[in-house]
Each structure stands twice: as C-alpha cells, then as structure tokens.
Amino acid sequence: MNTARLNQGTPLLLNAVSKHYAENIVLNQLDLHIPAGQFVAVVGRSGGGKSTLLRLLAGLETPTAGDVLAGTTPLAEIQEDTRMMFQDARLLPWKSVIDNVGLGLKGQWRDAARRALAAVGLENRAGEWPAALSGGQKQRVALARALIHRPGLLLLDEPLGALDALTRLEMQDLIVSLWQEHGFTVLLVTHDVSEAVAMADRVLLIEEGKIGLDLTVDIPRPRRLGSVRLAELEAEVLQRVMQRGESETRLRKQG
C-alpha cells in the first residue's frame, strides 16, 4: 500500500460503561479515554471483561449502561470504520486469498486488495487457497482484509495467541509498523504481558470491571527484546495481576 495514511485514528471515549449478563457484572461503570492513533493493550485475568470491552467497541454487544463514543459521536454510528481480528483468521476455505481480502466489497477492489496483500508480504499468494497457508500467513491475510477497509479503529482479540514464538514476533513487528505508517487507533487484548508492553503505548489492566492499572509505556521505538526497561514494566504489570489473584484466593478461603 502507499505511504499515505489510510485514515485518521478513531478517538474513543467510554463514559460510565457497564455490561451485565443477568446478575453477572462484567464491566462496572468503566471510564476510558483513548486519543486518536494511540496503541493500547488490555490485559487481565480470564473473565475480567477484556473481550467484552472489545465486543462493545466492535458493535457485537451493546452496553447495559453508559456511552461508547468516537469523539462526540456514538461509535455505533461509524461502525464501518472499525475492524476486528481474532485468534482464528476466519478465512473462507472455498475462496482464494485475494477473494478473502475483498470479502463483501463491491466494484473495482482487486487492485486495493493486492496492495493490502503487498503490505503484509503476501503479494505472491493472492491466487492460492487458505489451506496452503501457515497460521501466520492466514493472520496476515486477515490483517490485509482489515487494512483494505481503511480502518480508523483496529481491534485485536488475541490474534497471535495460536502462533509459534518466531512467527508471533514477526507479526508483532508487522502490526506495529503498519500502525505507525497509517495512524489508526489500536486496542489489543492479550494474555501475554510481554507482548502488551512490547507493542503498546499504554497498557490497561481490567479488574472487577474497571481500569485497575493504566500504565504508559514510555520506551522509544523500535523496542529491543531484552530491554531492562521493558522487563521492569512487564514485572510491574505482572505484580499487580498476581496481587489481585492472591487477594481473590484469600477471599474465597475466608468465604
């Protein structure tokens, strides 16, 4: 793709957002502001509300209470500017790679699809079937499918969780480089704290349906694996997660 930015990043504002499932409170009056173009990672224990937050932003769920805004506009009104990637690339096996990238598009989209594939290093695989691709290559196709829509907001729900270590690092670098080039806003949900710290400007820890930790990652890019500062920030987040886990264990024993 060319070096022009695809779109201006979407600014996000969540005001007192709650999400309940019957008696289960997953998000509890959560307040959050994400400036346009920021890369944010969300971590936390399973069941803490990370994926629910992503689903609200993707328009797959509606909040029980509160407002989800893109600046001053309800995010639901500009949902076409939002794209989401999952751990499973969700490619249609009966369609070629390029047809998966252009899925749902009308008109003359093939040139744009080829540019999107070139941006993720798969320009020579356009005519192949998904079955011929590795797991990492399938995720590159999913990323190209997101890029062709010129997103203002890219939501990543553990998209690298099933990849081997080396492929995962390559995909991390690719996502960060495309974000730097095009300026969209990114929200990454991950269980991997080292991944969160390595990729994001900011790491959020969700606890009891609210933001329990909001950590700025003030490390210049490109970031070097093995950096002492990266290790310190990772340890800070992990310590907070573990403290919370120990508190919950004590409460269960007392109960």
From Swiss-Prot:
ATP binds at residues 44-51. The keyword Chloroplast does not apply. Part of the ABC transporter complex SsuABC involved in aliphatic sulfonates import. Responsible for energy coupling to the transport system. This is Aliphatic sulfonates import ATP-binding protein SsuB. It is a peripheral membrane protein. It comes from the Bacteria. Its EC number is 7.6.2.14. PROSITE patterns: ABC_TRANSPORTER_1, ABC_TRANSPORTER_2, SSUB. Belongs to the ABC transporter superfamily. Aliphatic sulfonates importer (TC 3.A.1.17.2) family. GO terms for molecular function: ABC-type alkanesulfonate transporter transporter activity; ATP binding; ATP hydrolysis activity. The keyword Ribonucleoprotein does not apply. GO terms for biological process: alkanesulfonate transmembrane transport; cellular response to sulfur starvation; sulfur compound metabolic process. Keywords: ATP-binding, Cell inner membrane, Cell membrane, Membrane, Nucleotide-binding, Translocase, Transport. SMART domains: AAA. It comes from Escherichia coli (strain K12). Induction: Repressed by sulfate and cystine. Transcriptionally regulated by cbl. It catalyses: ATP + H2O + aliphatic sulfonate-[sulfonate-binding protein]Side 1 = ADP + phosphate + aliphatic sulfonateSide 2 + [sulfonate-binding protein]Side 1. InterPro entries: AAA+_ATPase, ABC_transporter-like_ATP-bd, ABC_transporter-like_CS, ABC_transporter_ATP-bind, P-loop_NTPase. Residues 12-233 form the ABC transporter domain. The gene is ssuB. It is found in: Cell inner membrane. It is an enzyme of class 7 (translocase). GO terms for cellular component: ATP-binding cassette (ABC) transporter complex, substrate-binding subunit-containing; membrane.
